[in-house]
Amino acid sequence: MKKLRTPMLILLCLGSLAALAATTALLYYWQHPIFGEPPKGERLTRITASPNYVDGAFRNQIETPMLTTDESRLSLMWRNFRGKRPETRPPQPLPTIKTDLRALDLAQDLVIWLGHSSYYVQLGGRRILIDPIFNDHASPFSWVNRTFAGTDLYTAADLPDIDVLIITHDHYDHLDYKTARALRPKVTTIVTALGVGAHLEAWGYDDYRINELDWGEVFRVSGTNRNSESSRNRSERTGKSTGKPALEIISTPGRHFSGRTFKRSQTLWMGLVLHTPTRRLFFSGDTGYGPHFAQIGAQYGPFDWVTLDTGQYNPRWAFMHMQPEEAVQAAEDLRARAYTPGHVGRFTISDHDWDEPFKRVSAASEGRSYALWTPEIGRPVYLDGRYQHFSPWWETVTKVEEAAGRDDE
């Protein structure tokens, strides 16, 4: 027995040491700045005064349970294993168009989808960047939530100087540490949801550049050389005219949550309206379907163009992201003239086929009151009313796979 006990004790000791080393490494990594910082001081005081902050966390305007089925992740994996597995990643690199962002005529109002929920926008002579992810993963761990092949088209070095950087919320597929750090020398002003500025300030952004909005608040970029003001400071400001039209950035509600650690909803999430005298655009941010779309459409619409959360839906979290058919209804609620699907095309966060959102939204958009625009990543979408044709590019990826299958026969 003694002979057996010695190896057993050695194994137990080694196992304990390994567990201790792993725990120590995890605790050390937990101090990495990638996780951001919680709101403190004046920022926290403003958060606690928000009508949307209740019992220590931000709340949605209507009841929004996080999970909507009792099925566990393990059960879901087992069901997928037994049945037909979804093709959550494309079998080939996605077709893209790398537009030279520095060479674009700034007088042209346009939007360029950068994949998932990232957008480069030119509006009223200003350059706006929304939820950029210039990284090959969207998580605190490099092997989790990897980008699709072919979609790592741009880096921060490819961008011109940015007048306004907008971050809708602090999830890793919308706010990336590496990207934020790389963009810092290029960004003049930041507009984000209440509390998110704590992360950005911890990552080296000057506090005076950061403007945080509660739902319904407005940030105004004026047409003078005194660049901007928030709706929280309505005093008149004057300066020399820049020749650019005024731009309003309006924070709108959504049905979602936030958090970069296990403690959720300590910062706000938002959609946004971009409004100039000649254009109205809407970005939903992450959201489930709800009455807020009709309210936004009535108050701020009609919209020349909208992009809506159309992917990463799942029966387990039915209120966190929209089904394609719900997004179609939201586009009509908003009184949109054109609609582009978002939250798709770069990451796998749910377990549907990677191209299913495009197929379903195309079918559901037949006969609707808006035009469905489905550009490739990197292709400019012009907002001046010109005719533009957008082909179902995702079908070319499927055809490549089918052709490869036929070659093997």
Q: What annotation goes with each model-predicted range?
A:
Residues 118-122, 243-302, 318, 322-326:
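Catalytic core of the metallo-beta-lactamase
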